[in-house]
Swiss-Prot record:
GO BP terms in the entry: glutamyl-tRNA aminoacylation
Main location: cytoplasm
Role description: Catalyzes the attachment of glutamate to tRNA(Glu) in a two-step reaction: glutamate is first activated by ATP to form Glu-AMP and then transferred to the acceptor end of tRNA(Glu).
SUPFAM superfamilies the UniProt entry points to: An anticodon-binding domain of class I aminoacyl-tRNA synthetases, Nucleotidylyl transferase
Catalysed reactions, as listed in the record: tRNA(Glu) + L-glutamate + ATP = L-glutamyl-tRNA(Glu) + AMP + diphosphate
InterPro entries: aa-tRNA-synth_I_cd-bd (IPR045462), aa-tRNA-synth_I_codon-bd_sub2 (IPR020751), aa-tRNA-synth_I_CS (IPR001412), aa_tRNA-synth_I_cd-bd_sf (IPR008925), Glu-tRNA-ligase_bac/mito (IPR004527), Glu/Gln-tRNA-synth (IPR000924), Glu/Gln-tRNA-synth_Ib_cat-dom (IPR020058), GluQ/Sye (IPR049940)
Enzyme Commission number, as recorded: 6.1.1.17
Motif range ('HIGH' region): 10-20
Subcellular location: Cytoplasm
Binding site for ATP: 254
Organism whose genome encodes this protein: Marinomonas sp. (strain MWYL1)
The name this protein goes by in its record: Glutamate--tRNA ligase
Keywords: Aminoacyl-tRNA synthetase, ATP-binding, Cytoplasm, Ligase, Nucleotide-binding, Protein biosynthesis
Length: 493
């Protein structure tokens, strides 16, 4: 049997997600238990959203949790480069191979033509997918368009009838009708590969034997199986893990739960407790004990113990487990050491001090001015907003609209946050000063604070959004009747 090789392949397009850490953990545990290797690959084909800063945050966050990898962009390895953007034109070569073999085709439709196609399908109650119109072009017509420099994508061919059989380690046999599968774009008009082509090519070239990923990829499995068949390659074993869920059983999302690993790091959770909790997501130790280390998980790991019921990511349960780790594993000396590392982290502290120093006269003043930087959720009440110069409904609506705008913000920097909030105040016809005042209360607990936009940038997106969410709830968010009206008003802004 060949060496077991698993991988995690995050996209560096935002904060490191707990879902990424969850899948990485199970990939690493499986590989280590089987005496194999765990690989990290960066899927940065989305050049408009991928950033080096996000990549660094992902690597740092996974390392903070105690995860490490045998090969990756930072440690190298025999099958690199481990960033897709650095792998040159290999994807174009493989896409061309599929064209030459008759398994893929050029498609020349404009965005407008594709939109019109989908709208017509929607009106007729048909599945919205590519209808294969470019397959009707003759070889001469295709060549003429290529010679004329008409922009194109390369799509894969899909069988018109029959069923794809997917074998899954946890779920057994899954059958998916080919009629449900789209003729996937493999190479985009800019020459960059889509996830589906790059993922299959890289997994093959990096000798990945087991693909352990979230169950949201089940419907994509037929495309991947077909690509392996088209290339004549051995298919890795598939394993689709259950998705993490909110306590209300909905898919884990930042609107209902903090999803960034950085949030839990900044909130003062122990990395051992967070990885322990992620290990309990759908899996259990043979003796059913709740508290265990990463090494203990790997020692006893059996992927068949994964339960397919949606595991609930409950922050209260995580806090309880973290408390157990603190009480059972830390002496006063080690607690003091970890607390100082967290609270007086030089990198974090140096961001705060330039805001604090102009506002203090003694060291003892620092706690009053900067205490909110070292807290989780603030104990604010409705009375804390009593000095705000806005009508109650306007205040409630302004805070809800601000939260929605912040949830949609992809670049979390001071100037971006300020510009978004200022623009929102203008379209809502509220003076910026009056609009910003409740933001101060939500973020710092008082209207007399250091710059709220500096504070939000330093605290990070998840803590800032969570505090805003708390403020919206304290003020009384929209009722069911108001919610639809507010959403329409917000969409019309």
């Amino acid at each position: 049997m060949s060496e077991v090789r698993t991988r995690i392949a995050p996209s560096p397009t935002g904060d490191p997600h707990v879902g990424t850490a969850y899948i990485a953990l199970f990939n690493m545990a499986f590989a280590r238990k089987m005496g194999g290797k765990f690989i990290l690959r960066i899927e940065d084909t989305d050049q408009t959203r991928s950033t080096p800063e996000s990549e660094k945050m992902i690597l740092d966050a996974l390392r903070w949790l105690g995860l490490d990898w045998a090969e990756g962009p930072d440690v190298g390895g025999p099958y690199g480069p481990y960033r897709q953007s650095e792998r040159g034109d290999i994807y174009g070569q493989y896409a061309q191979e599929l064209i030459d073999k008759g398994h893929a085709f050029y498609a020349f439709e404009t965005t407008e033509e594709l939109d019109q196609m989908r709208n017509e399908q929607k009106e007729q109650g048909l599945p919205q997918k590519y209808d294969g119109r470019a397959l009707n072009l003759t070889a001469e017509e295709v060549q003429a368009k290529l010679d004329a420099g008409v922009p194109y994508v390369i799509r894969m061919k899909i069988p018109e009838e029959g069923t794809c059989v997917v074998q899954d380690m946890l779920r057994g046999t899954i059958e998916i009708d080919w009629a449900q599968v789209d003729m996937q774009v493999l190479l985009k008009a800019d020459g960059m590969p889509t996830y589906h082509l790059a993922n299959v090519v890289d997994d093959h070239l990096m000798k990945i034997t087991h693909v352990i990923r979230g169950e949201e990829w089940i419907n994509s499995a037929p495309k991947h199986i077909l690509l392996y068949q088209y290339f004549g390659w051995d298919m890795p074993t598939l394993c689709h893990m259950p998705l993490l869920r909110n306590p209300d059983k909905s898919k884990l999302s930042k609107r209902k739960n903090p999803t960034s690993i950085l949030y839990y790091q900044r909130m003062g959770y122990m990395s051992e407790a967070v990885i322990n909790y992620l290990g309990r997501m759908g899996w259990s130790m043979p003796d059913e004990r709740e508290k265990f280390s990463l090494d203990e998980m790997i020692e006893h790991f059996d992927i068949q113990r994964v339960s397919l019921g949606g595991p609930v990511f409950d922050v209260e349960k995580l806090s309880w487990l973290n408390g157990m780790w603190i009480r059972e594993n830390l002496t006063p000396e080690t607690f003091a050491q970890k607390y100082v590392e967290w609270a007086l982290n030089p990198e974090y502290l140096m961001k705060i001090l330039p805001l604090v120093i102009p506002r203090v006269e003694t060291f003892s003043d620092v706690a009053d001015v900067a205490g909110f930087f070292l807290k989780g959720m603030l104990p604010i009440t409705k009375e804390d907003f009593s000095s705000i110069k806005l009508e109650e409904e306007t205040l409630r609506k302004a805070m809800q609209f601000a939260l929605w705008r912040l949830e949609a913000l992809s670049k979390w920097e001071k100037d971006e946050i300020f510009n978004e909030m200022k623009a929102l105040a203008q379209v809502m016809e509220i003076k910026p000063k009056d609009f910003f005042a409740p933001l101060f209360v939500a973020i710092s607990g008082t209207t007399a604070s250091v710059s709220v936009f500096d504070s939000m940038a330093i605290l990070g997106s998840d803590i800032s959004r969570a505090r805003m969410r708390t403020a919206v709830n304290v003020l009384g968010g929209p009722s069911k009747k108001e919610a639809k009206r507010w959403e329409k008003e917000y969409a019309d802004l």
